[in-house]
A protein has these predicted regions:
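Non-catalytic N-terminal regions of enzymes
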Residues: 1-196
């Protein structure tokens, strides 16, 4: 079945390859992809940095359909699940704060990220999480993000990162264009996943 064809309002079937990522997942082999980014801590911060990150995600959710969709399993698993728009994404769950114990070494950061990466994503929610990690001895803040491979392929992951991060200190206003494509995968050229 064509992965772009809709099965009702807001329902999009998973491709066979994307569904395979769900079926192959096990506790020993999570099927999410992840990134770890280090940022300079903003000067004169008056509130928790995680609140800024949540506001950023909230402002840009409309640019990233993969962050809004959750799985809708088919009855008796007779077919691949569908993606359905979650409506109200719980950013308290999806964007969490962690603080490293002193001294806040890179080894401690890597150990924490390894533990977070080993935890499976909740399939009843959109298949992603972000963790704002403070307490690094360098004064930096780390942001670890993970998203299920069923939700994005490589090119869609790059598009998600571009939708969320700015390359300049002053963010560029991003407003959705009328009748804009829903995602990079809807922009006309098939993604790697769709070509397989």
């Amino acid at each position: 079945m064509d992965a772009k064809r809709q099965r009702g309002p807001g329902l999009t079937p998973l491709s066979s390859l994307d569904a395979l990522f769900l079926h192959l997942e096990s506790p020993e082999m999570p099927m999410h992809v992840a990134g770890l980014h280090l940022f300079e801590m903003p000067a004169r911060r008056r509130h928790l940095y995680v609140d800024d990150v949540r506001r950023l995600f909230a402002a840009r959710l409309q640019l990233a359909p993969a962050f809004r969709r959750r799985l809708a399993p088919m009855p008796f698993d007779v077919a691949n699940p569908l993606w359905i728009d979650d409506g109200a994404v719980d950013l308290e769950h999806h964007v969490q704060r962690r603080v490293l114990p002193k001294p806040g070494t890179r080894a401690q950061l890597h150990a924490l990220v390894a533990r977070l990466h080993a935890q499976p994503l909740d399939r009843a929610r959109p298949l992603w999480q972000a963790f704002v990690i403070e307490g690094l001895a360098s004064g930096e803040v780390a942001v670890y993000t993970k998203i299920h491979h069923a939700a994005v392929d490589g090119s869609a992951g790059v598009a998600l990162a571009a939708a969320l991060m700015d390359l300049e200190p002053m963010p560029v206003p991003r407003l959705p264009k009328p009748h804009a494509v829903d995602s990079v995968s809807d922009a006309g050229e098939p993604t790697v996943t769709q070509r397989l």
